[in-house]
Amino acid sequence: MAATDTPWRPFRQAGALRRPMIDPAFVQGHPAYPDAFAQFFAGHGRYGHFAERVGNRNSRNGWRRRALAPGPAVGAEIVARHHEAAAQAGQGGDAARHQHRVDRLGQHHVRAAFEQVGRHFRLRGRSEHDRHRKGIVGADSPAHPPHQIARLLHAEIRVHHQKVDHFRPEVVFGIVAVVKAQQIPASQHAKGAGDDITAAEVEIAQQGAHTWGVVGHGLPSWQERTTFWPPAFRSPSDRSATSEFVAGLVNIGLSRLDKIWPGMPSSRFGFKRAYEGFMHVYRSHTCGQLKAADAGIQARLSGWVHRKRDHGNLLFVDLRDHYGITQCVIDVSSPVFAALDKARPESVITVTGKVVKRSAETINPRLPTGEIELQVAEVEIQSIADVLPIQVAGDQEYPEDMRLRYRFLDLRREDVHANMMLRSRVIAYLRQAMIGQGFTEFQTPILTASSPEGARDYLVPSRIHPGKFYALPQAPQQFKQLLMVAGFDKYFQIAPCFRDEAGRADRSPGEFYQLDFEMSYVTQDDVFAAIEPVLEGVFKEFGKGRAVTPAPFPRITYADSMLKYGSDKPDLRNPIIIADVTEPFRGSGFGLFAKLVDKGAVVRAIPAPGAAGQPRSWFDKLNDWARENGAGGLGYIQFAADGPKGPIAKNLEPARVEAIKAAANLKDGDAVFFACDKALPAAKFAGLVRTKIGNELDLLEKDVFKFCWTVDFPMYEINEETGLVEFSHNPFSMPQGGMDALLNQDPLTINAYQYDIVCNGVELSSGAIRNHRPDIMYKAFEIAGYSAAHVEEHFGGMLNAFKFGAPPHGGSAPGVDRIVMLLADQPNIREIILFPMNQQAQDLLMQAPAEIAMERLRELHIKVDLPKPKKEVKEG
């Protein structure tokens, strides 16, 4: 090859430096270039058109006029191929000069191209990149690390501004070419530059080359549209995949550069310094991302020191972040060993090193990263942790008050962290499911008026209006109904609700969240049809394979639910069905029950399948439990093979015993317990017994979510203390039968269009078809003892709106916290809330509630009148 056969020709721009440019006539068919590059630069005659677009100041992408330099795209190929050609020609001094020339040429373009990127990044500054980050690599960028080179490539095509003159498009093809050069047979490389290329690296290179349309595709169609970028940038997921591809190519190119130009270390040209500019300052990958295919690359990780293990000459550190754990290895002879050895657990560090495969016997199949480890070369301590009050690693139990006081540490623990991520994904699913059904999301006010909805309000004093208070909403009830009156057909929101009530296992004190929704022109069946697929879907999606009741869910009337299950929120996993056995005890020889029945009591039978063979101590234990729960005891009959046994059986005629056995669907080998009281307390106690026996005998169906609707709630009930009629549940429900029922029926016989959705004995939601007519609303409240003036005072806004045309409407509000609690299989709702209060409604982390300075109270015109402490009575 003659020395004059150069592929470069000058291209000058006013005010710009001379830059080499590929002569397509030289490239096409030249033996120094592979067919793919010849096709790329000269195929289909598109090269000139591309150069014209690059040089057009008014082009759509805003590119400034400049030349296309080959960079490493051709530099790597030229060096390898020309070394081979010169050696074969044996041209002596001419060959040496030729080699020197092409060496300098190739080295210049590798250095210039990569340092150009680094300089571009430094000139623009990180803040400008970060400003465009979401539009460049997607919102979930940590899952696909935003390597600076990938971010740069994305930014230049997606952000049209005037600083693009610092970027050279040949960098893209340079990265591809550096890797592609490694696929040349070792015999054609100087000093065997490609003899240790792994199959994984070849696969990455081939995949990447095809992604970018370089290999085997000639000039792809995307160039014919005069855009320089591949279709991989059309969606966030494709951009993320491209980011990973580019990062992989850079890593491989870096590891092979010294072999492509032997004797000319890359550090001499600032290549490694430029490459360090490509890696993010804190991480190139997450701690849950590296796999066996990444072996050989350089990686940077940041996270918390999860565990440390000192094996003498090696220190193993499990580094943890939000995404997972990666094992890092530090040799005792390493200069960074001392710094890392002193880092306590939960210190935050950044490590840089080489990814290597673990040996077969050290692979950890429990970790997604268990096939690799990081050989640490550099360590930066970001922050040192104090001695921990609670350990993050491990599964040690701690008192709840300590966990809540150090909740930020507790949230790092694997199970708690997973619960919060589950909560986030569930909320996202619910939101998308509702939008998919045509619902529109709105945000209703947080500061509103106080209204009597069954619990105490949290009150907020008004500084501007002395003596007056706002209230935090117990639910968006009135606002969502007003939205229907305002003409919005389907509303929903993930609504915060605030109630000043005591906490319990399935209820967080203070605040909770619900999937609140409302619909116009609907019946009860329409509401069910709207929410059932959402609930069925979310439990199937996140239920870890557990069975879910298929829609439509079964419906149980309130009366049947109280009779058969002893609760208006039945747990259908429990097969026990309660039976009414009042009549067999009426006038019987068992005087205790007979007398109570004569006074209006009822008797409920709670079967205990297969319990006849239990020892006497088991029955005595249940009897003691009943007394602890306020009952006089728990009578029972054992249906043994040799006949009924127990104190009650001895005082009943055989016919009555058989009637009980038939009514409760009992068989030999079963036992039965009894509850005798007025209807409501008897039903509630029987429900407690049903739950207790189901758990004692391990009868509950496993790995299943059992849904049902409880319907036909009574509109009114009698207050046992006052003897007055009051609303039993939601006062805004439409009475079944409308005005006619209110005028002509006994209030205690009127049912409402009201319903609850229940799963595994947990009430997820109450809902109703609303009372949208002012005349019916006035009458309904009148029966419950409220005057028209009272209704107008407390519900005037909604009532006034109804006077101007209100559509029939209804809705519900499944509790988000309870949904997540069930999916996470947690017994306590505080386990799925980020920063919960304790049972006493205290936030131990933020020390709330807290005393307020007197001057702030004066601004609010509030004087605190604390209860006087009780005086101790001294004995003697």
Swiss-Prot record:
<keyword id="KW-0963">Cytoplasm</keyword>
<dbReference type="Pfam" id="PF02938">
    <property type="entry name" value="GAD"/>
</dbReference>
<feature type="binding site">
    <location>
        <position position="763"/>
    </location>
    <ligand>
        <name>ATP</name>
    </ligand>
</feature>
<feature type="site" description="Important for tRNA non-discrimination">
    <location>
        <position position="311"/>
    </location>
</feature>
<dbReference type="GO" id="GO:0006422">
    <property type="term" value="P:aspartyl-tRNA aminoacylation"/>
</dbReference>
<dbReference type="Pfam" id="PF00152">
    <property type="entry name" value="tRNA-synt_2"/>
</dbReference>
<protein>
    <recommendedName>
        <fullName>Aspartate--tRNA(Asp/Asn) ligase</fullName>
        <ecNumber>6.1.1.23</ecNumber>
    </recommendedName>
</protein>
<dbReference type="GO" id="GO:0003676">
    <property type="term" value="F:nucleic acid binding"/>
</dbReference>
<comment type="subunit">
    <text>Homodimer.</text>
</comment>
<feature type="binding site">
    <location>
        <position position="729"/>
    </location>
    <ligand>
        <name>L-aspartate</name>
    </ligand>
</feature>
<feature type="region of interest" description="Unknown">
    <location>
        <begin position="1"/>
        <end position="278"/>
    </location>
</feature>
<keyword id="KW-0547">Nucleotide-binding</keyword>
<keyword id="KW-0067">ATP-binding</keyword>
<dbReference type="GO" id="GO:0005524">
    <property type="term" value="F:ATP binding"/>
</dbReference>
<dbReference type="GO" id="GO:0005737">
    <property type="term" value="C:cytoplasm"/>
</dbReference>
<dbReference type="InterPro" id="IPR029351">
    <property type="entry name" value="GAD_dom"/>
</dbReference>
<feature type="binding site">
    <location>
        <begin position="815"/>
        <end position="818"/>
    </location>
    <ligand>
        <name>ATP</name>
    </ligand>
</feature>
<dbReference type="InterPro" id="IPR002312">
    <property type="entry name" value="Asp/Asn-tRNA-synth_IIb"/>
</dbReference>
<feature type="binding site">
    <location>
        <begin position="499"/>
        <end position="501"/>
    </location>
    <ligand>
        <name>ATP</name>
    </ligand>
</feature>
<dbReference type="InterPro" id="IPR004365">
    <property type="entry name" value="NA-bd_OB_tRNA"/>
</dbReference>
<feature type="binding site">
    <location>
        <position position="499"/>
    </location>
    <ligand>
        <name>L-aspartate</name>
    </ligand>
</feature>
<dbReference type="InterPro" id="IPR012340">
    <property type="entry name" value="NA-bd_OB-fold"/>
</dbReference>
<comment type="similarity">
    <text>Belongs to the class-II aminoacyl-tRNA synthetase family. Type 1 subfamily.</text>
</comment>
<dbReference type="InterPro" id="IPR047089">
    <property type="entry name" value="Asp-tRNA-ligase_1_N"/>
</dbReference>
<feature type="region of interest" description="Aspartate">
    <location>
        <begin position="477"/>
        <end position="480"/>
    </location>
</feature>
<dbReference type="InterPro" id="IPR004115">
    <property type="entry name" value="GAD-like_sf"/>
</dbReference>
<dbReference type="InterPro" id="IPR045864">
    <property type="entry name" value="aa-tRNA-synth_II/BPL/LPL"/>
</dbReference>
<dbReference type="GO" id="GO:0004815">
    <property type="term" value="F:aspartate-tRNA ligase activity"/>
</dbReference>
<dbReference type="InterPro" id="IPR004524">
    <property type="entry name" value="Asp-tRNA-ligase_1"/>
</dbReference>
<comment type="function">
    <text>Aspartyl-tRNA synthetase with relaxed tRNA specificity since it is able to aspartylate not only its cognate tRNA(Asp) but also tRNA(Asn). Reaction proceeds in two steps: L-aspartate is first activated by ATP to form Asp-AMP and then transferred to the acceptor end of tRNA(Asp/Asn).</text>
</comment>
<feature type="binding site">
    <location>
        <position position="770"/>
    </location>
    <ligand>
        <name>L-aspartate</name>
    </ligand>
</feature>
<dbReference type="InterPro" id="IPR004364">
    <property type="entry name" value="Aa-tRNA-synt_II"/>
</dbReference>
<keyword id="KW-0436">Ligase</keyword>
<dbReference type="InterPro" id="IPR047090">
    <property type="entry name" value="AspRS_core"/>
</dbReference>
<dbReference type="InterPro" id="IPR006195">
    <property type="entry name" value="aa-tRNA-synth_II"/>
</dbReference>
<feature type="region of interest" description="Aspartyl-tRNA synthetase">
    <location>
        <begin position="279"/>
        <end position="876"/>
    </location>
</feature>
<dbReference type="GO" id="GO:0050560">
    <property type="term" value="F:aspartate-tRNA(Asn) ligase activity"/>
</dbReference>
<keyword id="KW-0030">Aminoacyl-tRNA synthetase</keyword>
<keyword id="KW-0648">Protein biosynthesis</keyword>
<dbReference type="Pfam" id="PF01336">
    <property type="entry name" value="tRNA_anti-codon"/>
</dbReference>
<feature type="binding site">
    <location>
        <position position="453"/>
    </location>
    <ligand>
        <name>L-aspartate</name>
    </ligand>
</feature>
